[in-house]
């Protein structure tokens, strides 16, 4: 069955575990070394923790989920750019809660190349930060439906560009 817009809704804090697991699995080649200090279980736990905390860039506040039989089968994080100073502060605070002070410093050091890869003019940009679909639900248009949903949100926000970072091994 194809993913319809009726099956996509805003993410909730109660979706944190499902979404964290989906994102950690989708980004597994990068997740363990970058987010879990080499440990995939720790990376998943940290993704879940970051997703659960309100207000940051990795928060459920900035995500939508695809639902099938009352289960989260896909997640997409998306938001307009530029990011407010308040949102950046909340992101940093969330990271400190999940990683601690030293761990947050290490995380942002590891992510420095991603930040520098973004376009400098973000005045009318929109950004897709994460997209993950459960393995058993792939091939049915769920990822495409989530991307279309985010694209429509970008249009409503008046964005002129939409940015997406992908990993070389995304499938």
Where are these regions (language model features)?
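Conserved GNAT-fold acetyl-CoA-binding loop/helix
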Residues: 28-51, 96-102
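Conserved acyl-donor/pantetheine-binding loop and adjacent beta-alpha core of acyl/acetyltransferases
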Residues: 82-125
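Conserved beta-strand in the GNAT
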Residues: 65, 71-80, 127, 132
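A short beta-loop-alpha structural element at the N-terminal edge
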Residues: 7-21, 30-33, 81
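Conserved acetyl-CoA-binding loop-helix of GNAT-fold acetyltransferases
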Residues: 135, 139-152, 156
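Conserved beta-strand-loop-alpha-helix junction that forms the acyl-donor binding cleft
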Residues: 129-138, 164-171
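Active-site rim helix/loop that mediates acceptor-substrate recognition in acyltransferases
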Residues: 40-63, 67-68, 115-117
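Conserved GNAT acetyl-CoA-binding A-motif
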Residues: 124-126, 154-167
């Amino acid at each position: 069955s194809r993913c319809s817009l009726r099956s996509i809704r805003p993410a909730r804090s109660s979706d944190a575990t499902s979404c964290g697991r989906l994102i950690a699995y989708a980004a597994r080649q990068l997740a363990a070394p970058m987010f879990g200090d080499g440990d995939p279980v720790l990376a998943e736990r940290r993704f879940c923790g970051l997703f659960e905390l309100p207000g940051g860039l990795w928060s459920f506040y900035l995500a939508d989920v695809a639902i099938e039989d009352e289960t989260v089968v896909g997640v997409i994080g998306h938001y307009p750019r530029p990011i407010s100073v308040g949102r950046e502060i909340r992101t940093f605070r969330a990271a400190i809660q999940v990683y601690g002070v030293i761990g947050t410093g290490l995380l942002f050091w590891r992510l420095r190349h991603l930040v520098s890869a973004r376009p400098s003019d973000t005045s009318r940009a929109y950004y897709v930060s994460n997209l993950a679909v459960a393995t058993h639900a792939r091939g049915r248009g769920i990822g495409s439906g989530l991307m279309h949903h985010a694209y429509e949100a970008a249009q409503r926000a008046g964005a002129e560009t939409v940015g997406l970072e992908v990993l070389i091994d995304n499938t």
